[in-house]
Amino acid sequence: MALLQISEPGMSSAPHQRRLAAGIDLGTTHSLVATVRSGQPETLADHQGRHLLPSVVHYQAQGYNVGYDARAQAADDPVNTISSVKRLMGRSLADIQARYPHLPYQLRASENGLPMIDTPAGLLNPVRVSADILKALAERAREALAGDLDGVVITVPAYFDDAQRQGTKDAARLAGLHVLRLLNEPTAAAIAYGLDSGQEGVIAVYDLGGGTFDISVLRLSRGVFEVLATGGDSALGGDDFDHLLADYIREQAGIADRSDNRIQRQLLDAATQAKIELSDADVAQVNVAGWQGSITREQFNELIAPLVKRTLLSCRRALKDAGVEASDVLEVVMVGGSTRVPLVRERVGEFFGRTPLTSIDPDRVVAIGAAIQADILVGNKPDSEMLLLDVIPLSLGLETMGGLVEKVIPRNTTIPVARAQEFTTFKDGQTAMAIHVMQGERELVQDCRSLARFTLRGIPAMPAGGAHIRVTFQVDADGLLSVTAMEKSTGVEASIQVKPSYGLTDGEIASMIQDSMSFAEQDVQARMLAEQKVEAARVLESLDGALKSDGALLSAAERAAIDDAMAQLRAAAEGNDASAIEDAIKNTDKQTQEFAARRMDESIRQALKGHSVDEV
């Protein structure tokens, strides 16, 4: 008689051997939660069968609502209805007010300048609001899986910086979730498509969601997902389509008052509905604030064309970073609800010369990929051979003498990664070293972004260059950076975990990369000049000390020649001619060679003083 394996509907046939894990797509406009059941990834629906959860929270003095119930309150109570909070994550209040001047809810500044949202439930930061959304998703998963989650994978835009990633982890912690890891959204999509289709080669992941745009160029080979390059815009998405269309409707309807939050919410709702209708129809009817009219797809396309073009410029930069052409890309994966817009699909297809892939629901594909990864990380697939390699978007390094940046980890290096370099002291008797962590592609500190500063103290007093300090940069799988500095002879060390107080401004990453290309030649010249000035300062300081201690070894004429050479070097170092400084250094070296030899002879003579030849 055959034996049958019996399991509860929707549950594993070996429930006691499996751990419960979920993938969460914490989106700007909508969020989802997914899991793997019976070997198949699936998104989880609410009691009404709805898979998407609006990323909206409505606060009252007695409590709060999340999702559809909260969104329903937006028109009547916009001040206390928080949406698109993902855009506020990791940003300063000043940055938010400059970027989003028409937010309906009230913002206040905390003591450290970070934003707090004024609600009937009190002053809440974006981390707390995100935590409330995560709680709703976690509860949906617990009900569907009939148990508590052992771990989750949460997706974030590839361009989220350290502060934004840390804020996401903090929100999960507030929600009572154990984060197995953060996963870049495009990489999650690659996991979903890679496992389903088993393709190998170069793939572009075009992710246009509600509030962010990411483009990633990946190489898929034998289960290995390697991100060759990333790009995008952390403040561009379907919400911007809605705002442009809402402003257009406002003009057509002749609504001049911009202070009425209720009217603004009605306009946005009407714009969103029209955008959805125009994905399938050529004309959408609009009825808002007593005005009736129509919007054509052609009019909508004209409004959003500049934004779509911006995404394609990011695609071009990412391909260049990856060292591939558009013709090398085998498939283009479309992710995010905004990729349903016909103009987006059309322009992306034209750019890459192929029809984009949309076989997996673009709203669900990221959550599905996260669920697959969570299932592996929680230990349900110990035999999995899939390897995931993310990259850092901008180079990481240190400030060195002369205002130069020494890159320790170049951009597009796969993570997790650890790199170390050794540095020495610049001055005699130096007992401390300031460590200035930098991010960017340029050669000079003034052109890069400061991430953090700390000081290594307790360095033994030695001559310049005598102490050796090993600085280690470590980026974990979530993209968070730890920097440790250690003096090798004593083992004394200091470290810092980089958690910037707020994120990069709009387009800053893209402009930093572009500037490094545009100013490459000038940067090389500037670095050469700075290096020569640092070397000149080192030579002059060393000679000043030598002359003070051993100047008696020189005749008056020899001293005058050295003084003259040093004066010429000082004059050259004050200028901006690297070649002139280099020549002056060589001249000074030539004039001091005999002096150096005499100092060496004198040192040997003093060392042998009082000893016989036999003792030597």
Curated annotation (Swiss-Prot):
Q: Does the keyword Secreted apply?
A: no
Please give the Pfam families that the UniProt record associates with this protein. HSP70 (PF00012)
* InterPro entries on file: ATPase_NBD, Heat_shock_70_CS, HscA_NBD, HSP70_C_sf, HSP70_peptide-bd_sf, Hsp_70_fam, ISC_FeS_clus_asmbl_HscA
Q: Which domain of life is it from?
A: Bacteria
Q: Which UniProt keywords apply?
A: ATP-binding, Chaperone, Nucleotide-binding
A molecular function (GO) term: unfolded protein binding
GO annotation, biological process: iron-sulfur cluster assembly
Give the protein family. Belongs to the heat shock protein 70 family.
Q: What does this protein do?
A: Chaperone involved in the maturation of iron-sulfur cluster-containing proteins. Has a low intrinsic ATPase activity which is markedly stimulated by HscB. Involved in the maturation of IscU.
Q: What is this protein called?
A: Chaperone protein HscA
Which organism encodes this protein?
Cronobacter sakazakii (strain ATCC BAA-894) (Enterobacter sakazakii)
Q: Corresponding gene?
A: hscA
